[in-house]
């Protein structure tokens, strides 16, 4: 089966809930919420990436998390985005969280980001990945076409949820 990194956030928890119970996957996550959702999926090999737990984020970060990520590779990274801008790329509000996201992105063959309209064309202080590194962008049907065109020009495949 396919291997995935899934980091934290409410959107990624919703994605985890949508994963069918009869699909064979390996999922590595630093999110306790995602781990909890997938814990009863019998065909999912679940790898929980430990480290310093940040309650506000619901994720583990820090040296232990980074060391675990360094030992793994994924076919696809479901990246939770705080901000997404065609010029600044993917950004996060927490430096430790951004560091883990960068490590996951660097060890993944592709990056998928699912965002709501309120995160499009916004930025946070810490850079995670360039817009051109996004393989798949999942957006609402009402997402502004001009913004989506900027991401398409940089190589992202656009999908409507």
Question: What label would you give each PLM region?
Answer:
Residues 1-21, 25-30:
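Helix-turn-helix/homeodomain-like alpha-helical modules used for DNA recognition
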Residues 32-161:
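Conserved phosphate- and dinucleotide-binding cores of soluble alpha/beta proteins
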């Amino acid at each position: 089966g396919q291997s995935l990194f899934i980091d934290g956030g409410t959107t990624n928890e919703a994605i985890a809930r949508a994963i069918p119970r009869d699909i064979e996957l390996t999922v590595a996550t630093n999110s306790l919420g995602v781990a909890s959702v997938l814990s009863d999926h019998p065909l999912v090999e679940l790898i929980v990436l430990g480290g310093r737990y940040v309650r506000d984020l619901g994720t583990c970060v820090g040296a232990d998390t980074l060391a675990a990520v360094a030992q793994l590779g994924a076919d696809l990274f479901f990246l939770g985005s705080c901000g997404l801008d065609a010029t600044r790329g993917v950004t996060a509000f927490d430096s430790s969280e951004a560091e883990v996201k960068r490590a996951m992105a660097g060890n993944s063959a592709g990056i998928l980001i699912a965002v709501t309209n309120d995160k499009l064309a916004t930025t946070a202080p810490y850079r995670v990945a360039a817009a051109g590194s996004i393989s798949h962008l999942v957006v609402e049907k009402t997402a502004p076409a001009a913004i989506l065109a900027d991401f398409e020009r940089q190589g992202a495949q656009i999908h409507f949820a």
